[in-house]
Amino acid sequence: MLCLPVFIILLLLASPAAPNPLEKRIQSDLIRAALEDADMKTDEREIVNIIDSISDVAKQICCEITVQCCVLDEE
């Protein structure tokens, strides 16, 4: 008589739970977003703009520290 409840409890523990529809949808959305992010390619113009911005900041810092950088830019 005790075997049947124990068997049912073990069966419930061993069986996979039904996936929650909301969790399943969130997981699929996250997977889709990750795949889209992986497929994105950085535009070459964006990279050039970033490098130009960094070099402008570096020139400003260099001009504050020494005049040599500013003289090189004027030539």
UniProtKB/Swiss-Prot annotation:
One of its GO terms (molecular function) is toxin activity. Coiled coil: none annotated. It is found in: Secreted. Disulfide bonds: none annotated. It holds the Pfam family Conotoxin. Residues 1-19 form the signal peptide. Residues 20-59 form a propeptide. The modification Pyrrolidone carboxylic acid is found at residue 60. Expressed by the venom duct. Contains 2 disulfide bonds that can be either 'C1-C3, C2-C4' or 'C1-C4, C2-C3', since these disulfide connectivities have been observed for conotoxins with cysteine framework V (for examples, see AC P0DQQ7 and AC P81755). The keyword Protein transport does not apply. Its main location: secreted. Keywords: Disulfide bond, Neurotoxin, Pyrrolidone carboxylic acid, Secreted, Signal, Toxin. One of its GO terms (cellular component) is extracellular region. The keyword ATP-binding does not apply. Belongs to the conotoxin T superfamily. The cysteine framework is V (CC-CC). This is Conotoxin Vn5.5. It comes from Conus ventricosus. The lineage of its organism: Eukaryota, Metazoa, Spiralia, Lophotrochozoa, Mollusca.
